[in-house]
Structures are given as C-alpha cells and as structure tokens.
C-alpha cells in the first residue's frame, strides 16, 4: 500500500520557469508602447463604485489587444489568459489571481465601442507603432528600415 505524501508537493511552476525566455516574447511590444497615453484615453470610462471590484481598465485593454493580435475570440482569449503565462504577464495578471471571463471581455469591448474609444485606442497604438516604423505580427515586433539608399545608375 502506497503512503500519502509526507511533505507538501511542489507547485507546477518554479521560479526558473517564470523567468524562461519564452515569457519575454512580448517584452519588446511592452517597451515600445507609451501605455500612459492609453491609460489617459481609458480613464474617460466611468468606473462604478458599486458591485464587485473591476479589473484594471488597462489590464482588460491589454487582453483585448492580445485577442486582436492573435485573432482570438473572447472565449479563446479568456482560456489563454487562464493557461498562458505569457498572456498573464502581458496583462499584469497575478499567477494565482482571477482572470476575466469571456463575457467580461466582450462587455468591456462593447463599452469601449459605445464610448467611441475602441477605434481611438487602436488608432493610438497604430500611431505609436508607425512613428517608430514598427509592424506587429501576432504580438511580435518587426522593425522596418526605410533608409533611402542611392543606387548607381545602370546602363551602358
């Protein structure tokens, strides 16, 4: 007969895994965007003082951005936020903390659309990226070097 654990089992995630290079894939994206400008736009949304405490608006918006960049439905995005440490890190969600449900993400997007902020926010993101000649592909940065180079004239 097998004995039960005498000691507490190790968690499935250790400090080493939390610093794995795969969890830094969105760090460049994080660094190039001026999030204070995004927060300023988001701050115009009324936050109710009643009911359950809400998620930070920037956390929800970061989640919606991941949904756009990775072409995820709200249900898929919520599932990724539960299981993907990279997504949790980008959205500033704690490892053991709650994660927004698909309905929360959808209601938040609808609220942004109703307040004419969704297109404005995406436009601000695109403006910042364009100013730095950056194209995002599935959350990864591609820097476009558009330096003009004079070529020698060809011909005889």
Q: What is the meaning of each model-derived region?
A:
Residues 3, 45, 62-63, 74-77, ...:
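Structured catalytic/translocation cores of nucleotide/phosphate-coupled proteins
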Residues 30, 68-69, 97, 110-114:
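Amphipathic alpha-helical interaction elements
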Residues 75, 79-82, 91-93, 100-156:
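Polybasic low-complexity intrinsically disordered regions
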Residues 49-50, 93-95:
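Short, surface-exposed loop/turn segments at secondary-structure junctions
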Residues 23-65, 69-70:
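Basic, short loop/linker segments at the boundary and entry of helix-turn-helix/winged-helix-like folds
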């Amino acid at each position: 007969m097998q004995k039960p654990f005498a000691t507490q089992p190790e968690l499935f995630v250790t400090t080493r895994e939390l610093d794995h290079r795969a969890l830094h894939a969105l760090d460049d994206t994080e660094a190039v965007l001026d999030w204070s400008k995004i927060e300023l736009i988001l701050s115009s949304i009324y936050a109710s003082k009643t009911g359950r405490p809400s998620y930070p608006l920037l956390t929800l918006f970061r989640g919606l951005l991941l949904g756009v960049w990775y072409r995820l439905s709200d249900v898929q995005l919520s599932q990724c936020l539960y299981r993907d440490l990279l997504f949790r890190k980008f959205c500033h969600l704690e490892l053991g903390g709650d994660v927004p449900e698909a309905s929360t993400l959808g209601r938040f997007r609808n609220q942004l659309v109703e307040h004419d902020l969704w297109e404005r926010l995406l436009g601000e993101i695109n403006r910042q990226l364009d100013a730095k000649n950056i194209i995002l592909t599935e959350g990864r940065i591609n820097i476009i070097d558009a330096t003009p180079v004079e070529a020698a004239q060809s011909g005889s």
